[in-house]
């Protein structure tokens, strides 16, 4: 399983429209990626590591694919349209991390 994470760094000047991201961008993304995208998750940063500190990332989006080749084929076919939507929800470029998921469980084993 491959996870593609988009990490939106937090700052005082950063703008992020979570409503637009969740209700317009992600559905558009899912439609374009089709069945290649197996799962999505969106997170909103609440706090940093120290009590009361701001989160390092204001928002994070995660996309899951069966393999790297599937992600590359699906994403690269629509990369221009997907990235052109960025100004509609944020004024910062996300940091992108592509990872191999090694453990993914629905509940902890005791």
Q: Which residue stretches match the model-derived regions?
A:
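Macromolecular interaction modules
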Residues: 1-110
């Amino acid at each position: 399983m491959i996870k593609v994470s988009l990490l939106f760094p937090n700052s005082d000047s950063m703008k992020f429209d979570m409503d637009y991201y969740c209700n317009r961008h992600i559905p558009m993304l899912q439609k374009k990626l089709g069945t290649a995208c197996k799962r999505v998750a969106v997170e909103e940063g609440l706090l940093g590591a120290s009590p009361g500190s701001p989160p390092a990332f204001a928002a994070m989006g995660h996309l899951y694919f069966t393999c790297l080749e599937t992600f590359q084929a699906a994403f690269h076919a629509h990369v221009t349209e997907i990235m052109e939507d960025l100004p509609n929800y944020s004024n910062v470029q996300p940091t992108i991390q592509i990872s191999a998921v090694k453990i993914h469980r629905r509940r902890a084993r005791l």
